[in-house]
């Protein structure tokens, strides 16, 4: 017998245009449904997310609905699909995380006990950790919920936490030169898609969404190799140290589009926690 949920799914799939809010509502209604129904809705949501149709806010909510259902695009650093092979202009041969590290990954890092394992922390990180509240505690209150959807990039992590996560997975943080090289490519692009900056191509303050989006939601913010969100969504901790400060690429949902171009940079204290600052992994291949 066909359920109301499946009937609604069929209606939306056959509609001439995509109603993003309706799709997001369908995703929310699927929570608690049968395994077969969840899988059908999840597959349909991924198909819409991987397109470009729909208003920004509707797509934001669609991505969050997928995150709560279980986003099949996500995997961990131990899986080959997590990484994208890239060769930079200087000949460096790298494997780079397709997306920023997500909330789902960070939750697993904490739940597995790896966050508490001192072997993953540098001496500076241990000194910082002794006086700091851990990420999971800060991410637990109800008011943090809009920023802790599983398929959103993790935010609110300090540089020390990002460093520890990377070390635990046999990786490190990108350098400023590497981040620029990934965005610019051999063509010396100012943005992952080329030039000029275009409205709706990256998740910057102009989108007026007020929080991070699911990773990979902005389909144009993508390099030819398949790296997502290098211009916007969340700013990126980089490995470069300047005394007590660390360099970041500042392009994010909370900053204007001028912060998203390849050569943009900022410096913040290593202990900074911000709702628009995340990180991405890299390793040599």
What are these regions (language model features)?
Residues 26-37, 41, 101, 109-118, ...:
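Short capping motifs at secondary-structure boundaries
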Residues 276-285:
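Short, structured beta-strand segments at or near domain termini in extracellular proteins/domains
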Residues 37-82:
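Long amphipathic alpha-helical scaffold segments
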Residues 5-16:
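Alpha-helical scaffold domains
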Residues 73-137, 150-161, 182, 232:
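A short glycine-rich, aromatic-capped structural motif
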Residues 46, 63, 67, 103-111, ...:
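Non-transmembrane alpha-helical segments in soluble domains
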Residues 17-24:
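HEAT-repeat alpha-solenoid elements in large eukaryotic scaffold proteins
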Residues 138-266, 270, 275:
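Functional-site microenvironments in short loops/helix caps that host divalent-cation chemistry
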